[in-house]
Design a protein with these regions (language model features):
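Cysteine-nucleophile protease catalytic domains, especially the papain-like/related folds used
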Residues: 9-120, 210-211, 221-224, 228-235, ...
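Conserved active-site-adjacent core of cysteine acyl-enzyme catalytic domains
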Residues: 4-12, 73-203, 207
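Noncatalytic regulatory segments and standalone regulatory/sensor domains
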Residues: 5, 154, 166-279
Length: 279
């Protein structure tokens, strides 16, 4: 990602297509002044909700937004099975963001989630631009463990970010304030519901009586999380250390949530818009 440092200005001779791909809720200067920085551990979802409501003219204290979103925490002191379970659902899902925004706004604001996995028949920036111009406020739910720049450490979480504007091939987001290429954002928005857990986070919580079979959800069985842990332990005993992460199920779905005021034409349009077609 490239941090935003200055406002992007389009030339007067931009063609119609470029104009159709441009829309801003806030200017970059306004975003710098108005954005909410992360309000707590695992609270990127609640942070996004604060800014969504702000953009829609509803002021809510960060603590109230966090309470309404019901941010879930990592249980770092738990034995491995419970720790992994907590990691799979830490933070919030798009469903929690929608419910939290509705509760915090006392029913004034509604949200509608659009799945982007499996891949959809949509051009992301023009699609976002159309909704932003209508007054909708988008929040991206992304798997940040995809498209990691070479040489950088793999992030350890998914992330919710408010999108405050788009330009041709570029998406503008808060928390942190970034401009990111459309290709990069789209890849992170089209992810299976999985999470990578670092080797050291697994091994330091492993105990002799550890029973991974307590994770009985079929998705844990399908990913053979127990087998992955066994493989990691075997490699450690043999001094190999090849497996850097295990893959576990995640509660999150990748995609875009669009928010609007309920008592508006846009709110009703959002509720009645069909899902994006699968490719």
């Amino acid at each position: 990602m490239e941090s935003v440092s200055e406002e992007v200005h389009g030339g007067a001779d931009e063609d119609e297509q470029a104009e159709s791909e441009e829309a801003m809720l806030w200017s970059i200067r306004e975003a710098l002044e108005r954005q909410t920085l992360q309000i707590g551990v695992s609270a990127c979802g609640a942070t996004a909700v604060v800014d969504v409501l702000k953009a829609l003219g509803v002021d809510v204290a960060p603590e109230e937004a966090d309470r309404c979103v019901q941010t879930r925490m990592r249980r770092n002191e738990s034995p491995l099975p419970d720790y992994l379970l907590s990691r799979s659902e830490a933070g919030a899902t798009h469903t929690q963001l929608i419910a939290g925004a509705e509760e915090a706004s006392k029913g004034k604001v509604i949200g509608r989630f659009f799945h982007l996995h499996p891949r959809r028949r949509v051009k992301l920036v023009p699609w976002l631009a159309r909704w932003i111009r209508k007054g909708a406020v988008p929040v991206a739910t992304m798997n940040m463990q995809l498209v990691v720049p070479k040489g950088e450490e793999v992030p350890d979480a998914w992330h919710h970010q408010l999108i405050f504007g788009v330009a041709p091939t570029t998406v503008f987001m808060t928390n942190p304030l970034d401009l990111v290429s459309e290709v990069e954002v789209h890849q992170r928005l089209c992810s299976e519901s999985v999470l990578l857990i670092r080797r050291e986070d697994v091994l330091q919580r492993l105990t002799p009586d550890c029973c991974m079979s307590s994770l009985s959800d079929p998705r844990w069985k399908a990913l053979d999380v127990e087998g992955q842990v066994r493989q990691m332990v075997l490699e450690e005993e043999q001094g190999q250390g090849k497996l850097t992460h295990i893959t576990i199920p995640a509660a999150y779905s990748s995609g875009i949530t669009l928010f609007a005021r309920l008592q508006s034409e846009l709110g009703q349009e959002l509720l009645n818009t069909p899902e994006l077609p699968v490719l």
